[in-house]
Amino acid sequence: SSWQKAGISFNKYLAIAARTVQRSLKNDLKVAAEKRYISDAKVQKLEKGNVVSTTDLASNKSA
């Protein structure tokens, strides 16, 4: 396959393909596509199976 011949991983190939498609979209569709890449990550500290604290990784705020 072409991605193997280029010496890149399949994940990198998919990322390049997705970026290429996203850049070729019209502005209204591009905004909707960019919103899909937003993700929220949180870390929860557990003690005895119960959540003790939650930390939002994006803003480093504890909840």
Swiss-Prot record:
A GO cellular-component term linked to this record: mitochondrial inner membrane
- State where the protein is found: Mitochondrion inner membrane
Stored Pfam families = ATP-synt_Eps
Q: Which InterPro entries match?
A: ATP_synth_F1_esu_mt, ATP_synth_F1_esu_sf_mt
Bilayer topology annotation: Peripheral membrane protein
GO MF: proton-transporting ATP synthase activity, rotational mechanism
Q: Which UniProt keywords apply?
A: ATP synthesis, CF(1), Hydrogen ion transport, Ion transport, Membrane, Mitochondrion, Mitochondrion inner membrane, Transport
Q: Origin, by domain of life? A: Eukaryota
Gene3D superfamilies according to UniProt = ATP synthase, F1 complex, epsilon subunit superfamily, mitochondrial
Question: Which family is it part of?
Answer: Belongs to the eukaryotic ATPase epsilon family.
Quaternary structure (record): F-type ATP synthases have 2 components, the catalytic core F(1) and the membrane-embedded component F(0), linked together by a central stalk and a peripheral stalk. The central stalk, also called rotor shaft, is often seen as part of F(1). The peripheral stalk is seen as part of F(0). F(0) contains the membrane channel next to the rotor. F-type ATP synthases form dimers but each monomer functions independently in ATP generation.
Question: What is the role of the protein in this entry?
Answer: Mitochondrial membrane ATP synthase (F(1)F(0) ATP synthase or Complex V) produces ATP from ADP in the presence of a proton gradient across the membrane which is generated by electron transport complexes of the respiratory chain. F-type ATP synthases consist of two structural domains, F(1) - containing the extramembraneous catalytic core, and F(0) - containing the membrane proton channel, linked together by a central stalk and a peripheral stalk.
Q: What is this protein called?
A: ATP synthase subunit epsilon, mitochondrial
Q: What is the lineage of its organism?
A: Eukaryota, Fungi, Dikarya, Ascomycota, Saccharomycotina
